[in-house]
Design a protein with these regions (language model features):
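Structural/interface elements that position substrates and couple domains in central-metabolism enzymes
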Residues: 1-187
Length: 187
């Protein structure tokens, strides 16, 4: 039942849940009742640390790179929408910047991002790594060979498990997928 809504896929790993309705709705459901909500509270706690963990995972992949440049693709809180309210991308970007990375952000749909958005080409240019935070359909169509020509590094962090693995590996990228526990080396 939980995964039947056409706009959600709650069983898919990701960098955190965003948007304005989940934090408000879960608090609203519990407010004014004597009902204990340990599951909701636990889920909110896990969700609050997931963006930090995601940023830290990418930064581990950048070990040994001085002044790393990261292309962050997607700031909307979910795929194929432009809404960037309460997005996990904000925490991820801030944490990467505090760790010393230069972050270039691209989102073709975002209407209310607090970040300076650039074109896809500008985001990828000279980047050591590209991090997919939002699962926009457009991102699935990015040509890995073109990305390789623009980037200085070959690190992909797929935070939504949306990329076809083989073409990215064949273009020389090492791909880490959030939630599958492995890093897939270039072929």
């Amino acid at each position: 039942i939980a995964n039947r809504h056409p706009r959600v896929n709650i069983h898919q790993p990701g960098p955190g849940v965003g948007g304005y309705c989940i934090p408000v709705a879960s608090a609203f459901l519990a407010a004014g009742t004597d009902v204990s909500t340990p599951t909701i509270n636990g889920a909110r706690r896990v969700n609050s640390i997931q963006p930090k963990r995601t940023a830290d995972q990418l930064f581990e992949l950048l070990t040994g790179i001085t002044n790393p440049v990261v292309a962050v693709l997607g700031v909307a809180y979910k795929g194929n929408v432009g809404d960037a309210r309460a997005t996990p991308a904000d925490t991820i970007i801030e944490r990467l910047e505090k760790s010393g990375a230069t972050v270039k952000v691209h989102d073709p749909l975002s209407i209310n991002s607090r970040h300076n958005l650039v074109s896809l080409e500008s985001a990828l240019e000279d980047a050591n790594a590209v991090m997919f935070i939002t699962d926009h359909d457009q991102f699935k169509q990015i040509d890995p060979t073109t990305a390789a020509k623009l980037m200085s590094g070959r690190i992909v962090f797929d935070g939504r498990n949306i990329l076809p693995l083989k073409p990215w590996q064949e273009a020389g990228f090492t791909v880490t997928r959030l939630g599958d526990g492995t890093t897939h080396s270039a072929t």
